[in-house]
């Protein structure tokens, strides 16, 4: 949702293997109807879209970018397909990956959940636009546990973290119910031992 309508929109990026142009384009949707559309800009393909949450709390989805070569993070604050403002957040080493962009502290602004792929540490940035208002560590979790979603599972207005164990063979799923970067409570969901079943989305 990039235009303050209730309907979700579709962000396209031309980044395929054959002559990618880096074009970014948005369809503004009403059901199956594209009621308007527009090109945002062209961005070189070493930049990847890593999220599209509302970073500044204006009710419009923004675009979070990360550069594959050097770990630089950049945000577009959007008004429809127009970049209202933009700025660099910071640069983070490449062994850290963006694992979620939920609103973990319930302030109406999307945040960034990081995971260190070397040691399993999880860390959060609480954002105000492209500024880091505050940050904090969640904890360190063994690498056989993977972050698979960050929905608001208990309805308190704050995004939570869904974990899945993909290594031990039992397919355990576990939830952290978050209050900022603090784990307010946690618990097992169930086990899905058939690894042919994968979590593809959280709603």
Which residues does each predicted region cover?
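Trp/Gly-enriched beta-strand/coil motifs that build multi-repeat beta-propeller-like domains
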Residues: 1-203
């Amino acid at each position: 949702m990039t235009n303050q309508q209730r309907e979700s929109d579709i962000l396209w990026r031309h980044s395929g293997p054959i002559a990618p142009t880096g074009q970014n384009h948005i369809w503004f949707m009403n059901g199956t109807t594209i009621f308007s559309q527009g090109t945002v800009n062209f961005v070189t393909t070493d930049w990847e879209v890593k999220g599209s949450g509302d970073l500044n709390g204006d009710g419009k989805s923004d675009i979070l970018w990360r550069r594959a070569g050097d770990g630089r993070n950049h945000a577009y604050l959007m008004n429809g397909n127009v970049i209202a403002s933009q700025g660099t957040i910071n640069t983070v080493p490449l062994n850290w990956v963006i694992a979620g962009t939920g609103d973990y502290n319930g302030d109406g602004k999307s945040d960034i959940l990081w995971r260190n792929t070397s040691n399993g540490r999880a860390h959060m940035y609480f954002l105000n636009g492209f500024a880091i208002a505050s940050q904090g560590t969640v904890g360190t979790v063994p690498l056989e546990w993977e972050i698979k979603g960050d929905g608001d599972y208990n309805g308190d207005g704050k995004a939570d973290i869904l974990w899945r164990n993909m290594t031990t063979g039992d397919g355990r799923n576990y939830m952290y119910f978050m209050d900022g970067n603090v784990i307010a409570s946690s618990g097992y969901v169930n086990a899905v031992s058939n690894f042919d079943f994968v979590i593809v989305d959280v709603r």
